[in-house]
A protein has these predicted regions:
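N-terminal beta1-alpha1-beta2 module of alpha/beta enzyme domains
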Residues: 1-88, 189, 386-388
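Hydrophobic faces of well-ordered beta-strands that scaffold small-molecule active sites
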Residues: 3-7, 58-60, 90-93, 121-125, ...
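An alpha-helical appendage that flanks or caps ligand/catalytic pockets
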Residues: 4-32, 144-180, 220-341, 377-388
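Active-site mouth loops of central-metabolism enzymes
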Residues: 28-41, 94-104, 185-196, 252-253, ...
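Acidic (Asp/Glu)-rich catalytic clusters
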Residues: 52-53, 78-87, 110, 114-121, ...
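Glycine-rich, proline-tolerant flexible connector loops at the mouths of alpha/beta enzymes
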Residues: 59-77, 97, 129-131, 215-216, ...
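Conserved, mostly hydrophobic/aromatic
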Residues: 62, 81, 113, 154, ...
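A conserved active-site cap/scaffold subdomain adjacent to cofactor or substrate pockets
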Residues: 196-220, 224-225
Length: 388
């Protein structure tokens, strides 16, 4: 198993919740202090560099118009890290290509980072979350189709080396595509795609790409992983599904004592609790399928708060959303989850969120790297999983 240190680069200094309608899209940026923002950027970059020193890989994402993720350009942050880190793989999960007007620009940016990092880039694609439809001035309908067409154009741009080509799709039309530079890794960097549903997992598996899923816990993760395994085999990729093709993201804090570990886990709950979002941003018409809307009405939305909901640490640990405690306790929690979902090869560890201090973040990273990671690396040897 590989561990990827992940932070959404949040700005936690928010007004009282009654003072704003939504934490995303419409919160006025007068609440943002650039001087504090500068310090937060320095701390997050230092933590990613420290993860690199500890032998942990790095994950970056991007979101827009929200204090919960003040990283609106994953390529910029990853370009910085390509220069200041030495060994870590650099995963962008991901580029919201359904909302990008110029997929060729994404192909160029990713190729440039891959060269700058000497082939350490892992490139993820996402269709974007619902609330970003409005700030992207994007059509909420057929976003999945737009994402895959943008993917096709990017892949062709990466792998065409004989001069310009023309691309005529349903959503994207480009003439004279001929990117410089081309990727360091040939034919292209490893590709990841996110999935929170079995349908998305099936599409990803058919292409043989890596899948990342977030905060699904014990209940929602097994169906996603099992759908991937089934489709992977049916696509003829082989009977054994590589563990390295599956990734899970949870909130993780490792302390010296159980009390310290739980205190850190409690701090990470900020990410779940500060998520006030009105329905017109949460679920724009046409974005979600009928089945997804039925699940939402049943309370099955992932990562979106119910009004008045205050997360309880023990409940979130029992769900497989938060993993915290001593090194032994965190390993046991992760091992139990690993066995329950049938195994996975990438732990996308959200080890920093909200008011968790820079010092505590680094302390947790140290325990994770030195006392938990060596045991996690032993899981799943040999590196494939049997039939689900």
């Amino acid at each position: 198993m590989r561990i990827w240190h992940f932070s959404e680069t949040a700005y936690p200094h928010l007004p009282a919740e009654d003072d704003y309608e939504s934490v995303r899209v419409s919160m006025p940026n007068r609440y943002y202090d650039p001087k504090i923002g500068y310090e937060l950027y320095q701390n997050r970059i230092d933590e990613w560099c420290y993860a690199d020193e500890l032998g942990i890989d790095i994950m970056i994402n991007e979101h827009h118009q929200t204090p919960t993720c003040v990283d609106p350009s994953a390529p910029i942050m990853t370009g910085v890290l390509a220069r200041v880190t030495k060994n870590a793989r650099l995963l962008i999960l991901g580029n919201p290509i359904a909302n990008r007007r110029q997929p060729v620009r994404v192909a160029e940016e990713m190729a440039m980072i891959d060269v700058m990092s000497k082939g350490r880039l892992e490139c993820g694609f996402v269709r974007s979350v619902p609330y970003e439809i409005a700030p992207a001035n994007s059509n909420p309908v057929r976003t999945t189709e737009r994402m895959w067409e943008a993917h096709d154009l990017i892949l062709k741009a990466w792998t065409t080396h004989d001069g310009p080509f023309t691309f005529e799709g349903e959503f994207f039309h480009h003439r004279m595509v001929n990117i410089w530079p081309r990727p360091y890794q040939q034919p292209h960097p490893p590709i990841w795609v996110t999935a929170l549903s079995t349908g998305n997992a099936t599409d990803i598996a058919r292409k043989g790409y890596k899948l990342g899923t977030f905060l699904g816990g014990y209940e929602k993760t097994p169906p996603v992983f099992n759908a991937y395994r089934k489709a992977y085999r049916e696509a003829g990729h082989g009977d054994e599904v590589p563990l390295e093709n599956l990734g899970y993201s949870g909130l993780i804090f490792v302390g010296e004592t159980e009390e310290e570990g739980r205190a850190g886990g409690q701090q990470l709950l900020w990410y779940l609790s500060h998520n006030k979002l009105p329905m017109h941003f949460k679920n724009p018409p046409g974005y979600a399928s009928i089945d997804a809307n039925v699940m939402a009405l049943k309370g099955a939305q992932i990562g979106v708060r119910r009004e008045g909901w205050v997360p309880d640490l023990d409940e979130e640990m029992a769900k497989g959303i938060v993993f915290c405690g001593t090194p032994d306790q965190v390993f046991d929690q992760l091992k139990k989850f690993y066995d329950h979902v049938g195994g996975f090869g990438n732990l996308l560890s959200m080890g920093q969120a909200g008011h968790l201090s820079h010092e505590d973040t680094k302390k947790s990273l140290t325990f994770l790297a030195k006392e938990v990671y060596p045991r996690l690396k032993e899981l799943g040897k040999p590196t494939s999983i049997a039939a689900a």
